[in-house]
């Protein structure tokens, strides 16, 4: 199988939005009923990722099977963390957002994490409390739970970090 990760292009948008809808179905079927409500992530959000050179697609045999945003610090919602602390609060970091894939696309998360750590050694990710699939994947990939952050909307997220040695 030929899998590549590359920067997303505007022409990928229809495929990216299909991946997002598939990811929402996975969330709902696993009991995560509240993360990624109607209209999120929107095409405008994905376009913003692309404009920051931070939108990436994962392709298998030329088919877009996944998407994620990989953006440099600072992440405004990460300035304050509750009930814990970041592993390191001095070093620059990258944040990963909007991770999505088709259910039949295997090893997407580990491939994405390998890609991210090839570009930075300090990665932060947050997820919804109900997103047990993501929490499991983060722990499996060596991320440490650091505490709680709040989005600009006021919604709570569980915050994780991993620093490569």
Regions found by a protein language model. Name each.
Residues 69-104:
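Conserved acyl-donor/pantetheine-binding loop and adjacent beta-alpha core of acyl/acetyltransferases
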Residues 4-19:
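A short beta-loop-alpha structural element at the N-terminal edge
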């Amino acid at each position: 199988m030929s899998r590549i990760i590359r920067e997303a292009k505007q022409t990928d948008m229809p495929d990216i939005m299909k991946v997002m809808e598939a990811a929402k179905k996975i969330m709902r079927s696993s009991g995560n009923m509240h993360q990624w409500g109607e209209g999120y992530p929107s095409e405008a959000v994905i376009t913003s990722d692309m404009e920051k050179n931070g939108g990436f697609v994962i392709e298998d045999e030329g088919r877009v099977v996944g998407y994620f945003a990989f953006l440099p610090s600072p992440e405004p919602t990460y300035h304050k963390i509750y009930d814990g602390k970041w592993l390191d609060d001095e070093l620059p970091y990258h944040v990963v957002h909007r991770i999505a894939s088709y259910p039949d696309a295997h090893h997407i998360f580990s491939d994405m994490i390998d890609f991210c750590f090839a570009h930075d050694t300090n990665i932060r990710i947050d997820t919804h409390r109900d997103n047990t699939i993501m929490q499991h994947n983060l722990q499996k990939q060596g991320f440490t739970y650091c505490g709680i952050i709040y989005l600009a909307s006021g919604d709570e997220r569980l915050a994780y970090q991993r620093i490569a040695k």
